[in-house]
């Protein structure tokens, strides 16, 4: 499981997928989410603007990412 550090919370799900290189663009990230290929905390998530906070676990295919807030 890979860790993702965010500088503030919440962050929209599609932005995390884009910035982590899972998707080449925001549009591609939204499409992946829309098609049910992404889960958050074990449940399929289809809301592109789902607010992600520290402690959330995102899964896409065989990749898992744990989100944590970066220290100040």
Segments predicted by a language model, with ranges:
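A basic, amphipathic helix-loop patch mediating RNA/tRNA/ribosome contacts
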Residues: 11-54
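A detector for short, charged/polar N-terminal pre-domain segments
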Residues: 1-11
